[in-house]
A protein has these predicted regions:
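Extracellular glycan-recognition/adhesion modules and their associated mucin-like linkers
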Residues: 2-34, 52-81, 99-128, 146-156, ...
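Surface-exposed turn/loop modules enriched in turn-prone residues
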Residues: 36-49, 84-93, 138-140
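Intrinsically disordered, low-complexity repeat/linker tracts enriched for polar/charged residues
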Residues: 41, 51, 88, 98, ...
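Generic preference for hydrophobic/aromatic residues in regular secondary structure cores
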Residues: 19, 39-40, 65, 85-87, ...
Length: 172
């Protein structure tokens, strides 16, 4: 079991984490969609499996970021490397578009950078509202490029139902 010290957070391969923006909203798979290409977005933390991620070691300091609910990896759309390339999920593959580096900051936050593009995980138009889309962008040292990785310590809410656009989460 490999671990790596990241600021004040220790990432362990067999644990799950939330990835939170500065406002506390977390990275999730939109509408708990299990399909390849499903959008990755920001949303209020509901302690749901589609908001939880594991970091699978893929080399020294390099990880694949895997969604707990879907089992799919955080991935660059069409293996893009330019500013504005959206981040989505895709089945695990030996693809450089699924490799990420976690760089600690001195304040407990981290930057998550694409190993392929060298660009930061970023919020489109610096939007921090529910539904904000994730992309990669050159490192501009903005708050929209810093993340807090928190270990999940509570049992997640796992069952979800969608009735006519109303999202219901049932505690297990």
């Amino acid at each position: 079991m490999a671990t790596k010290k990241i600021a004040q957070t220790v990432i362990t391969e067999d644990k799950f984490y939330t990835i939170a923006a500065a406002n506390g909203k977390v990275v999730e798979v939109k509408d708990y969609n299990t399909e390849n290409g499903a959008q990755i977005q920001l949303w209020d933390n509901a302690n749901a499996e589609w908001q939880q991620w594991s970091f699978v070691r893929a080399g020294e300091g390099v990880y694949r970021i895997k969604n707990r609910f879907t089992g799919k990896m955080m991935d660059l759309d069409c293996s893009g490397v330019t500013d504005g390339t959206h981040v989505h999920q895709w089945e695990g593959a030996n693809a450089s578009s699924q490799l990420w580096i976690v760089e600690p900051a001195n304040d407990g936050r981290v930057k998550i950078k694409s190993n392929l593009a060298g660009k930061c995980l970023d919020l489109v138009n610096m939007n921090t509202e529910n539904g904000a889309v994730l992309q990669i962008w050159a490192d501009v040292n903005g708050d929209n490029q810093y993340w807090t990785i928190n270990e999940v310590t509570r049992k997640p809410k796992t069952s979800a139902t969608n009735f006519s656009g109303v999202f219901v989460v049932n505690a297990v």
